[in-house]
Amino acid sequence: MAFKRINKELTDLGRDPPSSCSAGPVGEDLFHWQATIMGPGDSPYSGGVFFLAIHFPTDYPFKPPKVNFTTRIYHPNINSNGSICLDILRDQWSPALTISKVLLSICSMLTDPNPDEPLVPEIAHVYKTDRARYEATAREWTRKYAI
């Protein structure tokens, strides 16, 4: 089941790729993908290229994939290990979701962080209290790690 579904998503991604994102298998392993997200133009991540690792469980799509940033990023919902705090990757996962939809959700999270459910409370605090400093630091990290 998982193999067939992952193959279908790969085909669909090739046919109709989401804007500013791409993803595909690492080598021959269909259960391990690498994804690329271009930093949204209307965010402090603009101009950056961010890489993510995607690991599909054997019972996909009934369990969510594990998705991690491998590029460092300054964001309240993404920690230094690249873990992402996103409800659809946890309790709000549904088998109707696809990697394409997950990547688009991550893109929109880059534009609109959720400081009320932070993975990094310090960054969320800066986001809420000093937006200019948050954006300057996010731009600096983007230049340093993603360009």
Curated annotation (Swiss-Prot):
Pathway: Protein modification; protein ubiquitination. SMART domains: UBCc. Catalyzes the covalent attachment of ubiquitin to other proteins. May also mediate selective proteolysis pathways. Belongs to the ubiquitin-conjugating enzyme family. The gene is UBC1. GO terms for molecular function: ATP binding; ubiquitin conjugating enzyme activity. The lineage of its organism: Eukaryota, Fungi, Dikarya, Ascomycota, Pezizomycotina. Induction: By hard-surface contact. Ethylene and the host surface wax enhance this induction which is essential for appressorium formation. GO terms for biological process: protein ubiquitination. Its EC number is 2.3.2.23. The active site is at C107. Residues 1-147 form the UBC core domain. Keywords: ATP-binding, Nucleotide-binding, Transferase, Ubl conjugation pathway. This is Ubiquitin-conjugating enzyme E2-16 kDa. It comes from the Eukaryota. It catalyses: S-ubiquitinyl-[E1 ubiquitin-activating enzyme]-L-cysteine + [E2 ubiquitin-conjugating enzyme]-L-cysteine = [E1 ubiquitin-activating enzyme]-L-cysteine + S-ubiquitinyl-[E2 ubiquitin-conjugating enzyme]-L-cysteine.
